[in-house]
Amino acid sequence: MRRAMTDNDHHLHSLALAAFEQLHTAMLGVVDMFTHESQVTTALLGVLAQRTPITTLVGNFDITSERASLTAALDGYETHRRHARVALWRVMLAEGCSIGEISRIFGLSRQLVSRQLRDIP
């Protein structure tokens, strides 16, 4: 027999839903970033295929800004992915799942699961 959801269960589910919505938004940002990076790489491949000098082209390109944007997008994705995973674990714990079972399901050590549950708000 399934137990009724408590207020805490509803709260944990709401937190997990919000975390996965943020993860989804971050994923879309990474998709946009990789689409842009792919376009830049395609253009660079065309220049390289023609064996034309690329020093001036690359010198006029703001590589630092591109790298910073890519790093920020990937960092945001990774942060939201970690938060979503921990929110899901909290729901699983509330449903009676043990840390050992969570670690087996996700292929992680119990120590890592415990530490992330403790350290990630």
Map each language-model feature to its residues:
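General nucleic-acid-binding
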Residues: 1-62
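DNA major-groove recognition helix of helix-turn-helix
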Residues: 106, 117-121
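Short, Lys/Arg-enriched N-terminal segment that forms or immediately precedes the first helix
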Residues: 64-78
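Short alpha-helical "recognition helix" segments of helix-turn-helix
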Residues: 98-108, 113
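Generic, well-ordered alpha-helical segments
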Residues: 58, 62-65, 81, 94
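Short, amphipathic alpha-helical "recognition" segments used to contact nucleic acids or chromatin
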Residues: 81-97
